[in-house]
């Protein structure tokens, strides 16, 4: 039997990206680490900063809930979220966030932002990601990996699903993941893996890419 795989045109990809971008955020994690002074033997503290992407997955009457990788928020003293929408005042795009829940075994975390901290202008432009069903995926389906980590800028790559339920071990914990040849990097880690309809089917994990086959990206199925 013939096997038909829908192929996205450049126009389709642009349209999916345009629809998805308002649900993609940049997350900055500021922490503090101890550093021993070489001269006096005293302990000094040094600020650290790391960045990743996140996906708006729900909106309640009080807050926005954002999915990301656990390693993006791990050890955070201070978290901030930057929304990727055009704003009249650029300061409005960056707000403080709190970790709502973590699952280190699956490298997933949920971050919350109070709606009261987000201007009405920004709120009106944000979108909640449309959930897909990773159980319906087939090898050969086209996918889009999208993210917006600060320091990397907007990152979009297109590829195909290479394998499903691929066992990947990170920090001695094994998980079944979606394997794709779409590049998953620190620019889109924590961001969205979308199907050909623009629905969210996975959360990209650059940490998994470090441990896997070269040229292969991995996403945590949703």
Language-model features and meaning:
Residues 1-222:
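Serine-dependent protease modules
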């Amino acid at each position: 039997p013939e096997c038909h795989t829908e192929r996205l045109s450049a126009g389709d990809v642009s349209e999916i990206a345009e629809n998805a971008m308002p649900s993609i955020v940049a997350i900055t994690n500021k922490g503090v680490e101890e550093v021993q002074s070489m001269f006096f033997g005293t302990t000094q503290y040094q600020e650290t900063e790391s960045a990743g992407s996140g996906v708006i997955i729900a909106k309640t009457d009080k807050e926005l809930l954002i999915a990301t990788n656990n390693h993006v928020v791990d050890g955070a003293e201070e978290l901030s979220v930057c929304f990727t929408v055009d704003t009249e005042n650029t300061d409005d795009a960056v707000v403080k966030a709190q970790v709502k829940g973590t699952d280190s075994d699956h490298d997933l975390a949920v971050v919350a932002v109070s709606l009261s901290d987000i201007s009405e202008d920004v709120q009106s432009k944000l979108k909640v990601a449309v959930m897909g069903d990773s159980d319906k995926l087939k090898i050969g389906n086209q996918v889009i990996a999208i993210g917006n980590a600060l320091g990397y800028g907007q990152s979009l790559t297109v590829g195909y699903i290479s394998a499903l339920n691929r066992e990947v071990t990170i920090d001695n914990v094994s998980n079944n993941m979606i394997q794709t040849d779409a590049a998953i990097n620190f620019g889109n880690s924590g961001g969205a893996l979308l199907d050909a309809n623009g629905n969210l089917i996975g959360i990209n994990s650059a940490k998994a890419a470090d441990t896997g086959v070269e040229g292969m990206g991995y996403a945590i199925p949703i």
